Design a protein with these regions (language model features):
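Extreme N-terminal tail/first-helix region
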Residues: 1-20
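Structural motif corresponding to alpha-helix initiation and N-cap regions
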Residues: 12, 56-57
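Short beta-strand segments
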Residues: 22-55, 72
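Short, structured patches in soluble enzyme cores that scaffold and shape functional sites
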Residues: 31, 73-75, 148-151
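Helix-adjacent hinge/juxtasegments
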Residues: 58-93
Length: 159
């Protein structure tokens, strides 16, 4: 029997760069019979990942039942000749500090502008597409979550 080919691991500097380049993740919640996965935009401050979550839906129920999650971020070429991903297992915490929430919301506004995202992305954050972008900062239509207590990181690359 031949040994399987293994995808090489990425050093921390490389997966931090992957996290900085991307802005969409998938969060797997485990507080149900079967895992539930949902896409989330995020911002990264160099130490923590932050997410904005609308205040309705299954994710809120699963978060309140069990905040332990897996977060996955990926990048790949269209033909899959090169791909990278990082998976982080940790705990989501709802940010309560008003000043910190404002900073994170401002980071989201800056990221949306920098990436030139469609106004339709506002619907994923609890806003109408024709709302001003600064409504993200001024209004509390979404919860601010922070990934903490990361115990396990798997970061792999090919190409």
């Amino acid at each position: 029997m031949t040994n399987p080919v293994k995808i090489p691991h990425m050093p921390k500097s490389e997966y931090d760069n992957l996290i900085r380049r991307q802005y969409v993740s998938r969060i797997a919640f485990g507080a149900c019979d079967q895992p539930y996965i949902a896409p989330f935009m995020y911002v990264f401050d160099g130490k923590f990942l932050y997410f904005l979550s609308t205040k309705y839906g299954r994710k809120m129920e699963y978060f309140s039942q069990n905040p332990k999650v897996s977060v996955e971020i990926e990048e790949y070429s269209p033909d899959m000749s090169a791909f990278t991903f990082v998976s982080l297992r940790g705990i989501l915490e709802e940010v309560q500090d008003l000043a910190k929430k404002k900073v994170v919301r401002r980071q989201f506004v800056d990221m949306i502008r920098e990436k030139k995202l469609s106004p339709l992305v506002l619907t994923a954050l609890g806003h109408k597409p024709d709302d001003p972008l600064d409504a993200i900062v001024k209004e509390e239509r979404s919860a601010v979550w922070k990934l903490t207590g990361v115990k396990d990181i798997v970061a792999l690359k090919n190409g």
